[in-house]
C-alpha cells in the first residue's frame, strides 16, 4: 500500500549530536533523490554525497535508499545522515518539504505505515 504522500522527519533526538538522521518514506522519494543529489545510487548502499540546492552544496551527507517493498515501511524510503545541530537538519528538511507531496510525519507514522504494509507482526 502507498498512501500517496511522502512523509519526512528527523529520526534522531533533537540536540547537539554530531550526526542527525532524516528519514523520508513514500512515492516522492525518488523525486527527493533527483532534486538534491547529482547521482543515482543503488539500493541498500551507503553513499557519500553532496546535498545540493541547485549548484549550492548545503551539506555533505551519507544517504541510503531502500526500494519498496524491502524497507521498514514497505514503501520507497531514504535515510539521510547529515551533520548534527538543528541548523543543518532544519535546513535540509525545509528543502525536502518544497517538493509537492512531501510533508512532515506525524509521531509514529513510520511505524503505522510499516504495520499497514504488513511489515510488522
What are these regions (language model features)?
Residues 1-121:
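A glycine-rich (often HGG/GG-containing) alpha/beta subdomain
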Amino acid at each position: 500500500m502507498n498512501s500517496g504522500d511522502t512523509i519526512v522527519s528527523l529520526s534522531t533526538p533533537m540536540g547537539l549530536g554530531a550526526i542527525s538522521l532524516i528519514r523520508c518514506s513514500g512515492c516522492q522519494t525518488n523525486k527527493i533523490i533527483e532534486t538534491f543529489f547529482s547521482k543515482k545510487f543503488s539500493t541498500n548502499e551507503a553513499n557519500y554525497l553532496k546535498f545540493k540546492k541547485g549548484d549550492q552544496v548545503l551539506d555533505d551527507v551519507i544517504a541510503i535508499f531502500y526500494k519498496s517493498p524491502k524497507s521498514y515501511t514497505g514503501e520507497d524510503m531514504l535515510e539521510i545522515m547529515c551533520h548534527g545541530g538543528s541548523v543543518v537538519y532544519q535546513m535540509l528538511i525545509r528543502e525536502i518539504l518544497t517538493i509537492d507531496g512531501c510533508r512532515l510525519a506525524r509521531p509514529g507514522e513510520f511505524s503505522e505505515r510499516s504495520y499497514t504494509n504488513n511489515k510488522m507482526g
